[in-house]
Curated annotation (Swiss-Prot):
Lineage, uppermost ranks: Eukaryota, Metazoa, Chordata, Craniata, Vertebrata
Matching InterPro entries: 4_helix_cytokine-like_core, Somatotropin/Prolactin
Region annotation Disordered: where it falls in the sequence: 80-99
Subcellular location: Secreted
Biased composition (Polar residues): 80-97
Entry-linked Gene3D superfamilies: 1.20.1250.10
Assigned keywords, A-Z: Disulfide bond, Glycoprotein, Hormone, Secreted, Signal
Signal peptide boundaries: 1-30
Disulfide bonds: 88-207
Pfam families: Hormone_1
SUPFAM superfamilies: 4-helical cytokines
Superkingdom: Eukaryota
A single MF term (Gene Ontology): hormone activity
Designated name of the protein: Prolactin-5A1
Organism encoding this protein: Mus musculus
Length: 230
């Protein structure tokens, strides 16, 4: 779905007011439709996508660092890397496994898929802290990075929800709110044996890194589809 491109309104003051309000609002559903129709919609979407793209890149990079840090600390001989990982809890037929498939999806569908993927990592910090607190070595370094990742996931989710709310102003049939399932911790971290537990954590960080790459790709695709040539 592409929004029709409209020439920007001459009143820069109105747009600046809209942007400043956007930063304070928990929900942008109160943005007046008339503002959406004068070109401000495209500008606000572009503004949010700029922030979201930067966060998603950081999320992707930090997830990769966390996986590498964990393997360096707890799998120095790379035994885990030579084994198939556990099936990722976000694996689903509805989630495209490459960029080409994602590009063929309708933007509103891909947007929902991306939000669902992020929601599936909602309890990441809780599970990591509970399962790494008693490990030898320096788990606090990894936990500190997971705390940053947790904040990035929350920011990404909020931004994508705001984008969805704005799009619902243009397309009233688009659902504004949906229930997105959280993650129970299975299958990675509910293990008692240390070696199995470590492999489960390796699989967790592997899946997180894989999803972070997908989220970054999906956001890039959504930006090109929804605010092209901005």
């Amino acid at each position: 779905m592409r929004l029709s491109k409209i020439q920007p309104h001459q009143s820069g003051t109105l747009l600046l007011l809209l942007l400043s309000n956007l930063l304070m609002w928990e929900n942008v559903a109160s943005v007046p439709r008339c503002i959406m129709e004068d070109g401000g919609c495209q500008k606000v979407l572009n503004y949010i996508f700029n922030m979201t793209s930067t966060i998603s890149e950081n999320f992707n990079n930090l997830s990769s660092e966390t996986l590498n840090d964990f393997d360096t600390e707890y799998d120095p001989h790379q035994k885990f890397q030579n084994r198939p990982t556990m099936t990722c809890h976000t694996s689903s037929r509805s989630v495209p496994n490459n960029k080409r498939k994602a590009e063929r999806m309708r933007p509103v569908v891909l947007l929902n898929v991306t939000i669902r993927m992020l929601a599936a990592w909602k309890n990441l910090l809780h599970h990591v802290e509970n399962n790494m607190a008693d490990l030898d070595g320096t788990p606090y370094v990894i936990i500190s990075k997971v705390k940053l990742i947790d904040r990035q996931i929350k920011k990404l989710t909020k931004n994508l929800q705001n984008i969805k709310t704005i799009l619902s102003q243009v397309n009233p049939d688009l659902k504004k709110n949906e229930d997105y399932p959280a993650w129970s911790g299975e299958p990675y971290v509910q293990q008692s044996k240390r070696r199995v537990q470590l492999f489960g954590l390796h699989s967790l960080f592997f899946c997180l890194n894989n999803d972070a790459q997908k989220v970054s790709d999906f956001i890039s695709i959504l930006r090109d589809q929804i605010v092209p040539n901005q």
